[in-house]
Amino acid sequence: MGVTLFKEVSYTLSKLIDSIEMGEIGLPEIQRPFVWPNTKVRDLFDSMYRGFPVGYLLFWANGSGGGHRQIGTGTKQRVPQLLIVDGQQRLTSLFAVFKGIPVVREDFRAERIRIAFCPLTGRFEVTDAAILRDPEFIPDISEIWSEQSNIFELADAYIERLRRARPVTPQEQKAIQKAINSLDNLSSYPFTALEIASSATEEEVADV
């Protein structure tokens, strides 16, 4: 066996989000635009909420300082140290929903992905007109992780909205608060990344 060209690194989701926001993680030019349908984004959050694994990430240490794109449309603060080789769709989905920002589709159209959550059933849905009218759902989970949000106030506001539609039992109130707290805790969801050394060539990385 030759020299090992990768190492295994553990991340929390919040660390990944912060690294993308700071520009430490970017997209190499060989990657695709965002192509996932919103239902796949919904399913990703559902799997994470239920505690299932959602796959490894594959990063490539950026030795050149060029040939990359970054997630989102804002100006990043630094040259990416890591380029995403596998996991672009998952990380773009998570970053867009956590930060409440639009993704750029293949036709260069900006789209905000809105995912709804029902605390009493643990169900996720793509937000539509019917979901917006349904008091059982939080219509946009992005607000959970907004810097302006308070998780306790958000839970209270949801319960109050539900009470205007029907009675809420004390047991339901506890279940709602627990579910919203569990959703908030997705920021600590664990990911494992394999980081390929910068000495690997683009051809070698493409063959992985």
Regions found by a protein language model. Name each.
Residues 2-208:
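Basic- and aromatic-enriched surface patches that contact anionic nucleotides/nucleic acids
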